[in-house]
């Protein structure tokens, strides 16, 4: 079996590569990693680096050729051409990072492609809360919507699910969209407090307005701060927790406190 991981040097793609190696590496099959610069990718020696970029579909035909399974990182701007190339190459199964809401067109294109697929729809990433790093160091988090309920999931858990799906019998998962969450739903205020618990530091939470929130987040997030805060001015639904990570991998998702403890250097 040949598995191609796209976005293989990105935040989640690289984790998928590492998880495939942990699950068996070459015993699973030929693991290939799509990257724009193989020389700088620093991939493990057992992984075959393939040059290409999802943003330039004309670089992808050779990458998909001979690929049985593909982990598809999200790149909505070229999703139509990318899916067509996978169909032409005879790709047998796609595990795609996707979702609902603003990802709906991307998800719909995958569902309509004719490819055997499973989609993963994570909510808020635990890693997004690194944006609070400077505030948590100061002991006070100011947030635009502290009572909004979320169930953040770590990128490591998302990658574990993707790798397990790529290597497990696929029939039960075909056509599914799995929402991926952490183990418990919390208000954003409680998320901040749980990060504090994970690193052993009390954290106070105060509500704030849009302008103040943007001023606090822009130094960390750049222009992404505006897009992120726009979400809270839309009809953003609370996110309930589920046990899909545990059901799909056999190991429960880590909590935000556990994630913070592993990433303590972001907050102290």
Q: What residue ranges belong to the model's regions?
A:
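Oxidoreductase cofactor-interface core, primarily capturing Rossmann-like NAD(P)-dependent enzymes
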Residues: 2-44, 55-61, 65-67, 77-204, ...
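Adenosine-nucleotide cofactor-binding segment
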Residues: 47-48
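Periplasmic-binding protein-like
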Residues: 71-73
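Cofactor-binding loops of NAD(P)H-dependent oxidoreductases
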Residues: 51-53
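Generic detector of short alpha-helix boundary/capping microenvironments
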Residues: 1, 146-147, 238, 247
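A hydrophobic C-terminal alpha-helical subdomain
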Residues: 211-268
């Amino acid at each position: 079996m040949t598995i191609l991981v796209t976005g293989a040097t990105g935040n989640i793609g690289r984790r998928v590569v590492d998880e495939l190696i942990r699950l068996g590496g070459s015993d699973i099959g030929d693991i290939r990693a799509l990257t724009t610069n193989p020389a700088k990718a620093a991939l493990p020696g057992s992984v075959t680096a393939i040059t290409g970029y999802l943003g330039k579909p004309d670089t992808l035909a050779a990458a998909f050729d001979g690929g049985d399974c593909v982990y598809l990182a999200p790149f909505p701007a070229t999703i139509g051409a990318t899916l067509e190339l996978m169909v032409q190459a005879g790709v047998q199964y796609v595990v795609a990072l996707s979702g609902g809401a603003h990802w709906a067109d991307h998800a719909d294109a995958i569902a309509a492609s004719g490819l055997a697929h499973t989609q993963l729809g994570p909510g808020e990433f635990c890693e997004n809360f690194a944006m609070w790093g400077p505030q948590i160091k100061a002991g006070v988090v100011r947030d635009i919507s502290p009572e909004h309920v979320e169930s953040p999931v770590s990128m490591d858990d998302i990658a574990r699910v993707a790798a397990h799906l790529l290597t497990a019998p696929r029939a039960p998962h075909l056509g599914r969209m799995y929402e991926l969450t952490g183990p418990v739903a919390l208000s954003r205020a409680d998320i901040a407090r749980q990060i504090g618990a994970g690193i052993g530091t009390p954290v106070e939470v105060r509500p704030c307005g849009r302008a103040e929130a943007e001023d606090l987040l822009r130094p960390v997030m750049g222009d992404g701060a505006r897009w992120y805060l726009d979400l809270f001015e839309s009809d953003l639904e609370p996110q309930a927790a589920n046990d899909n990570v545990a059901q799909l991998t056999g190991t429960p998702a880590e909590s935000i406190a556990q994630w913070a403890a592993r990433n303590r250097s972001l907050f102290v």
